[in-house]
């Protein structure tokens, strides 16, 4: 009897312990964010619409007041930020182009604004031309050097990027610290990157600057996630939403936690559907496709992938989704050649390690293993530390009978499964 009682207590304690362990895996709580999924209004969006109406009327009444065009452009950019509607980004471009032409590209702030619009469109070389034009004007040099750093990083011109970073050095500057964080993240030093981003956040909080707090909280949400600090990531996204309830990027971050960490596919889909109702961009279909793949629902996976391509056809996104397209096409031997064509264009547009990774991955998937290895060794190894890039590198090594080189990468990837997503768990274990 005593033995039976002891056994019962042991089993009960074990079940209790398992229950506690299971509960500790739960990072999110619906009560924290559900209120952000059914918002009826968006104050930022409403204000932008009112501003557009106001400035359009003023411009119509006085077409010689060119400065009104920049006001209109800024508000159309806000519409793009909150709705994802690419037409608003192009409208902003048209207004800024018209303004720059009227000023004969002599007003530095307007030139920089158009350059930033080009960055959003992934037209990086054109953005660089405008940034250099702004630098030649001379006015507001430090602001232009910040822009130059941003563009050079996108283009993979890292020595030039560092020169501009050093030129704006100021450890008390939010703008400098966030760029220093980006530079360290690029180098693969995530811990240092987080430290500098936290310093930037502290400045934003000290100044009580709402816009900078939103920016730093959302970016820290990403950085903490990359570092496996999921609870801190979640809290940062919630802080973002507390300041801007319509900030869809933070909700997307929470959806990723729910999917990748908690494996709650129904809740992840609920969040994504709520975001897509107001902020409709193609990448949400890809996320839903990933979730369906994890569930083993091939029909739903293909339905969402087709919806992604359908949206791509209906809208002109330019080069903005080239990376997504190349990765999708590379996964299917029948479309791998398409991936190769896109990857070549990407390398031409922005010869970064990530672009060369796309090229190497595409070559691997069309059966050119040695070509893939050559590109990876020359342009990727030691130059990008993104988990997906590292996975591609391991696969390239494995396909070239270099299993010993793939082994340490596999060990590193096993600690990056949250960032990679559930669908990579089996792939990484099979390396």
Regions inferred by a protein language model and the residue ranges of each:
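TPR/TPR-like (Sel1-like) alpha-helical repeat modules
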Residues: 169-173, 201-202, 276-282, 290-310, ...
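Generic helix N-cap/helix-start motif at coil->alpha-helix transitions
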Residues: 31-32, 66, 103-110, 137-145, ...
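N-terminal leader/linker segments that initiate helical-solenoid repeat arrays
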Residues: 20-109, 129, 162-163, 408-411, ...
């Amino acid at each position: 009897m005593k033995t039976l009682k002891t056994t019962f207590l042991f089993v009960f304690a074990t079940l209790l312990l398992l229950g506690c362990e299971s509960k500790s895996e739960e990072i999110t709580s619906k009560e924290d964010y559900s209120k952000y999924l059914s918002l009826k209004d968006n104050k930022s969006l409403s204000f932008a619409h009112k501003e557009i109406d106001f400035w359009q009327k003023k411009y119509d009444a006085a077409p010689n007041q060119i400065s009104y065009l920049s006001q209109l452009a800024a508000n159309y950019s806000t519409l793009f930020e909150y709705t994802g509607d690419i037409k608003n980004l192009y409208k902003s471009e048209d207004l800024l182009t018209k303004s720059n032409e009227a000023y004969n590209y002599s007003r530095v702030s307007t030139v920089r604004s158009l350059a930033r619009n080009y960055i959003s469109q992934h037209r990086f070389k054109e953005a660089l031309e405008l940034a250099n034009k702004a630098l030649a004007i001379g006015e507001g040099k430090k602001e232009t050097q910040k822009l130059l750093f941003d563009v050079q990083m996108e283009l993979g011109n890292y020595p030039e990027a560092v020169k501009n970073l050093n030129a704006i050095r100021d450890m008390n500057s939010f703008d400098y610290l966030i760029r220093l964080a980006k530079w360290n993240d690029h180098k693969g030093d995530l811990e240092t990157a987080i430290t500098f981003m936290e310093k930037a956040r502290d400045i934003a909080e000290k100044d009580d600057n709402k816009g900078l707090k939103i920016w730093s909280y959302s970016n820290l949400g990403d950085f903490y996630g990359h570092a496996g600090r999921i609870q801190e990531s979640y809290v940062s996204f919630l802080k973002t939403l507390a300041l801007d309830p319509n900030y869809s990027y933070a909700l997307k971050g929470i959806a990723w936690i729910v999917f990748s960490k908690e494996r709650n596919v129904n809740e992840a889909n609920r969040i994504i559907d709520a975001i897509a109702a107001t902020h409709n961009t193609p990448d949400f279909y890809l996320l839903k496709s990933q979730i369906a793949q994890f569930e083993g629902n091939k029909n739903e996976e293909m339905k969402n992938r087709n919806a992604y391509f359908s949206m791509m056809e209906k809208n002109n996104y330019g080069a903005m989704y080239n990376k997504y397209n190349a990765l999708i096409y590379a996964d299917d031997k029948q479309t791998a050649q398409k991936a190769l064509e896109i990857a070549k264009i990407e390398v031409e547009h922005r010869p970064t390690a990530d672009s060369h990774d796309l090229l190497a991955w595409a070559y691997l998937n069309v059966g050119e293993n040695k070509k893939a290895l050559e590109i990876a060794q020359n342009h990727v190894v030691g130059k990008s530390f993104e988990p997906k890039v590292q996975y591609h590198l391991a696969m390239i090594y494995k396909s070239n009978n270099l299993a010993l080189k793939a082994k340490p990468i596999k060990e590193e990837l096993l600690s990056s499964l949250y960032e990679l997503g559930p669908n990579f768990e089996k792939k990484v274990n099979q390396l």
